[in-house]
Amino acid sequence: MRVSAVLSRGAAPSELVDAELDDPRSDEVIVRIEAVGVCHTDLVTRQRLGERPAVLGHEGCGTVEHLGSAVTGLAVGDRVVVSFASCGGCDQCRAGLPGYCAWATALNGSGRRLDGSPTIRVRGEPVFGSFFGQSSFATAALADARSCVPVGDVSPEVVAPLGCGFLTGAGAVLNVLRPRHGDRLLVIGGGGVGSVAALTALSEGVEVVVAEPVLARRTLPERCGATVVASLDEPMPSVTHVLDTTGRPESIARALALLQPCGVLALVGLGPAEVSLDVWALMTRGLRIRGCVEGDADPALLIPDLIRRYQRGLLPLDRLVTTYPLADLDRAVADQRAGLTTKPVLLPGG
């Protein structure tokens, strides 16, 4: 199937190119992409791949166009959010924790199917694709049917980021930290993940503090009831829970210092591989540190729940999103880095 796709190659400008999708296998579908979020993981992967040509994108939303022969539960014409890939059969998948799938790295980050076959070609040559089981910086994506969550009649640009970034922020609060009404949560970083985490916690009656240096990213959480600070060095009360979206060692150290005894720190940010910790403080204050992938979420369960919260006015996801044409990936990334947008979303038709 011929599609238009955004091809990335190291530091070179992205380009919109003609590409060829492989035919769907029995457990795959082709989704006509209507919107796709830009996530920090796309940028990290682009840097990691160096000069290797790649079609990235892993927060796709669109309409199912073709079904593999064994696909059930989906129909042509269904609007779906395409989330991360998982095998469905390992211990973690069966336990409802597909983010920790035994095959997660191969399925989401190898650039090919599990058997090593490519899913997308440019100028006749295979390129890095099947990113998070989709590679949705394109007008259509070949996706694992298991990754597709039907969402009904909702705005694609609003729900597309639920495939990863928004899912991670909300899931970290609801599934991992689980603060109770009246607890105090510190969210470090007010990007897409942090903002949704803050909004989710506020909807649960939790007191929220957001630490974010960019003024524009502090505005919405503050209007929704959060206390906002520009820096962790500003005076603030102790907290029961912390969500760090930055991965910075200095932020993690400050988070641990601010936690009340028996408090919990959840980590969702990609940072340096090593961080120094005061083991004595962890032990004597009963502190817990918890890693978190994809919000410990089962997308098929949490995505519909978050959409219902949005529709009830509890999660103003639309106010986080700025849209761009598909070809303007680099401008969207530049705007995000400059603090001009919280969550850029690309529109293949716009």
Segments and roles (model prediction):
Residues 84-146:
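Cysteine-cluster motifs in flexible loop/terminal segments that predominantly coordinate metals
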Residues 139, 146-148, 152-232:
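Mid-domain Rossmann-like dinucleotide-binding core that forms the NAD(H)/NADP(H) cofactor-binding site
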